[in-house]
Amino acid sequence: VQVLLGNGFYNEQGGRYHKLKVSFGPPTLLLALHITYHDGSKETIVSDAAWQWSLSPITFNSLYGGEDYDARISSTTWHPVVVQQAPKGILRPQLAYPVKVMEHYEVAQTLRRDSILVFDMGQNLAGFPEITVKGKRGQHIKITPAETLTDDLRCNQKQTGRPHYYTYTLSGKGTETWHPVFS
């Protein structure tokens, strides 16, 4: 079992736009996975001191500030987890519907300003970008969403909070497709 943890509201990262000014600590996991097999047998997998952690290609994630992904990182170095003391109080589930992609939008218009491309979606929408690119190892792509543009075609984030952006660092291994996972 592998689990990818993001910061969420629990550990709001600074350095970019964020609404919360507090952090409750690093991402933490308490897992009890109940499995019922086709033959009726059951198994429970729980997170404990035997689990391990490793870095991921996601080097920054914030609900409001964006996400950075370095496709060159493929860590195979595993470390023992740090077992934390259980919080006080009664553990209650937090029920939430999954985030689903409801619709894909194509770019309505592409504008160029020097080495910067501006992709106009043709409407205001809530969503996240997905890119498919091919390039050299270590090349960086920065995606800055905005509701409006300045007169010189720069992103204007005054209405939405700033700075908010995504970066993707290419692995250089052929065609690469990426979209943020945690923002």
Where are these regions (language model features)?
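Extracellular/oxidizing-compartment recognition motifs
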Residues: 2-183
